[in-house]
Amino acid sequence: MMKSAILLMVSCVFMFLVVSYIQDVEGANKRCHLNQMFTGKCGNDGNKACLGDFKNKRFRYDLCQCTDATQISPSLPPQRVCNCSRPC
């Protein structure tokens, strides 16, 4: 009888810890994204360039990924796409 009670208590504590962890992970993963095109190529430090471009925006973005856009016409300057995110 005592073993069953202890097993039940340990199971309840374990379930509580698992549920709490899942809620923490879901809260940490919520990020707001913004994609925007800028003139120029990404180069070696494209992610830093994107962070600099987004510095003057209303929100502070902390993660960026730079991708060179396909050039449609040779007469147009090269473009890059910045995909940046911040905690919501």
Swiss-Prot record:
It is found in: Secreted. It comes from the Eukaryota. The keyword Signal applies. One of its GO terms (cellular component) is extracellular region. Pfam families: SCRL (PF06876). Keywords: Antimicrobial, Disulfide bond, Fungicide, Plant defense, Secreted, Signal. Residues 1-27 form the signal peptide. Disulfide bonds join C32-C88, C42-C66, C50-C82, C64-C84. GO terms for biological process: defense response to fungus; killing of cells of another organism; signal transduction. Belongs to the DEFL family. This is Putative defensin-like protein 228. It comes from Arabidopsis thaliana.
